[in-house]
Regions:
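Metal-dependent phosphoester-hydrolase catalytic domains
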Residues: 130, 173-183, 190-278
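Generic enzyme active-site microenvironment
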Residues: 34, 70-71, 154, 185, ...
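N-terminal, active-site-proximal structural segment of metallo-dependent hydrolase catalytic domains
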Residues: 2-5, 16-93, 107-109, 267, ...
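Active-site beta-loop-alpha substructure in enzyme catalytic cores
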Residues: 152, 157-175, 181-184, 188-191
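Surface-exposed cleft-lining segments at the edges of enzyme active sites
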Residues: 40-46, 130-132, 153-161
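Active-site environment of divalent metal-dependent phosphoester hydrolases
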Residues: 39-43, 76-79, 108, 160-162, ...
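Structured beta-strand-rich core segments of catalytic domains in phosphoester-bond hydrolases
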Residues: 74-150, 245-249
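Active-site neighborhood of phospho(di)ester-bond hydrolases with catalytic His/Asp-centered motifs
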Residues: 70-72, 99-104, 183-187, 210-214
Length: 278
């Protein structure tokens, strides 16, 4: 009887000591993040375009305390979506002071556009910025941001294999000219796991190492081996100047005491990598 009571106490203590999912940064670390927003429609199609969903995604970014962020599936000035500037709205709702940089890659809804974007915490000054436009059945872009210690490229690769290869070549060629370490972050629509259909990843692997978590998938609900397509890469020539501290594909997170399933927020999970510049 005493053993049973003792076991119950131990189990209860174990249950109550389990911490909600949180991801603290190491002191001095810079957190890089890539997140496909699904236009802030929620985790499913058709989803809903509303401010509530924008706030939910922004709260994930706030909880992760990210410093430099690549965001995909953004829209701007679309009449059917309230003529919103989605990247800026996300930034505002985080409550964090970010500089936002948007690449209007493709026309959408008459006078609107869709594209990718980047958010950079304002205590990390942007030295220079370049937007490179990439081939695609849906036109694509890569935002090249030079910071003090590294270059951050935010992109969203095309679904067309041949055009994805062309876009990857442009990014790789540009990165070779850069003296600082280079990160490429985004939904690459490609994977090192795709033995037959991997069109562009072998090109990246010539110049970059994978700097992000590769355990499991980045698309919620997918159990097949090919659903890991969101990455943060680091240039091989710059890896000696960067220490990778931590990286996670974030599937759930604690926000205000509640555990949030991030499959409800977007159809991609966010991926972060914490770095220290040497």
């Amino acid at each position: 009887m005493k053993k049973a009571i003792l076991l119950s106490i131990v189990l209860a203590g174990t249950l109550f000591s389990v911490k909600p999912q949180s991801y603290p940064k190491a002191p001095g670390a810079i957190r890089l993040l890539t997140y496909n927003t699904h236009y802030c429609k929620g985790g499913y199609d058709p989803g809903e375009i509303n401010e509530s969903n924008v706030k939910k995604l922004a709260q994930v970014i706030k909880a992760l305390d990210a410093d430099v962020i690549a965001l995909q599936e953004l829209d701007s000035a679309s009449q059917s979506r309230g003529i919103r500037y989605l990247l800026h709205e996300i930034a505002i709702h985080t409550g964090i002071e970010y500089t936002d940089v948007y690449a209007n890659a493709a026309r959408f809804d008459k006078k609107g556009s869709i594209g990718c974007g980047a958010l950079v915490r304002k205590n990390l000054p942007i030295v220079s910025r370049i937007i490179a436009y990439l081939p695609g059945d849906e036109p694509r872009a890569a935002i090249q941001l030079e910071l003090e210690k590294f270059v951050f490229i935010a992109t969203h690769s095309d679904l067309n294999n041949e055009k994805r290869i062309q876009g990857t070549k442009i990014i790789c060629n540009d990165s070779r000219e850069m003296k600082k370490p280079v990160f490429v972050a985004g939904d690459l629509n490609d994977s090192f796991r795709w033995s037959r259909n991997s069109a562009s990843f072998p090109l990246y692997q010539k110049d970059f190492i994978i700097a992000s978590d590769t355990v499991g998938n980045t698309i919620p609900g997918r159990t097949n081996n090919g659903a890991l397509i969101d990455f943060i890469l680091l240039s091989k020539k710059g890896k000696n100047k960067i220490k990778i501290v931590d990286s996670k594909i974030v599937r759930e997170i604690n926000i205000e005491g509640k555990t949030i399933d991030l499959g409800e927020i977007s159809d991609h999970y966010p991926v972060f990598t914490d770095i220290i510049c040497k």
